[in-house]
């Protein structure tokens, strides 16, 4: 979710791989079969929602690729499911991983282990109950990197840069493949010049993924409560759009929920940058590579904690459109 394989950061996604990816060292994006926007790069803020999203994706996979359809005597040929588990494996992260593995019940488990034993997960089928017996193939791989004493070492990657590159690759899709956009500077300039889509404000509802927004009766004030913290903020209703402007939002169709729960987050069809808001005309201006035919069905913006990379806000000779003071227009 922090550095997912085939989507921008913040997503939990089910992606169908039909051919080998030639080079995993560069960002490779694929349109997922189904995706849910968690809206953050770590599950620490809300592990329960994270797990529910994982379970929804897994249930969808079982239903679509294993269960027989109406009129079929047996299910489709089995499609293998490879799960990239989270890297947070201490404390609550470990508990979440155990719950995930018990729900999914994998047939194979691959662990990459290093010489610092305290950083490894327990050996064996650590997630099973004591009286539970399941046939699981365990595969352990030693780290390929070793020091002068033949001890495995970890190579720290710049996670922030990897996330920025994924966002770069995603919004690069706003332009034709033969369009010359190879650097953050070029993409920033191209996005500034790109004509945005117009989306009526009246059509859109906003779902805040990691805070609760409540309206006070007889008052033009909103109470914003940040989940998993004790922080709350009072925001005038007239200024609530400032939280959306210049942000990355998920695009969703409210009727396309991933479960029957009224609190379930609908499937996400893509991301957009809110380029500007004209309050007097009731219009959002958004930049997105999502096709117009899909965008026309969108009636829900999902606001998480994803940030526009700083490199896309810095264009020499231009005032960043996402940080201007006059982007909210009122009559």
Language-model features: where?
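Preference for solvent-exposed, low-hydrophobicity sequence contexts
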Residues: 41-46, 110-331
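Intrinsically disordered, low-complexity, Ser/Thr/Glu/Asp/Lys/Arg-enriched terminal regions and linkers
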Residues: 1-186
